Amino acid sequence: MENRHKPFPTPYPDLNRVLRDFVDRVQAVLSTNFVGAYLQGSFAVGDFDLHSDVDFILVIEEELSHEEVHGLQAVHEQIYGVDIPWAQHLEGSYFPKEVLRDHARRGGLLWYLDHGSRSLIPSAHCNTVLVRWVIREHGVTLAGPAPARLVDPIPVETLREHIRATMQDWGQEILSHPDPFNNRFYQGFIVLNYCRMLHDLHRGFPGSKLAG
């Protein structure tokens, strides 16, 4: 396996310690079902800071067994309990490698850790064209092969179609159910994300909120 551990995947020593511990524990549970571990999101595309979520992708040979899910639930509980603030800000999904490779297989449920959570749930949150593009083009390897070897190229127009659909779907959700978004945090969050999506749509590839 290439690059078992990248020694300094981020500029934050405490976060690097959390990530090393996390990957070691996951590998111990998955054994030969482990393919690789990667950072995506702001730690991949840039403009991260001390308040950023830590978005990860774990790639596996095949769907998780019941026993593996049980073991990983324990791992996430243990990592969340680490006395380092970064440990409570992990977010990501477990992708079977053939699902990750083909963007046509987007939208299905994966085992997912929500930001601030300590347990996995089924969710399609990360199973998108955008996440695949970021992993392929900018993914930060924590362990495993280079991410470009795991994801097929994604046409620019496919990416633009995804961005347009996200803008429309999210806009409809906000207008249909505005109450959860009627606060200072979400209003700023929405503006930043729409600026980013418009910027990405113009350029044809994803960037950071700051760039948007």
Which ranges hold each PLM region?
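Conserved NTP/Mg2+-binding pocket subregion across the NTase superfamily
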Residues: 2-8, 74-184, 191, 197
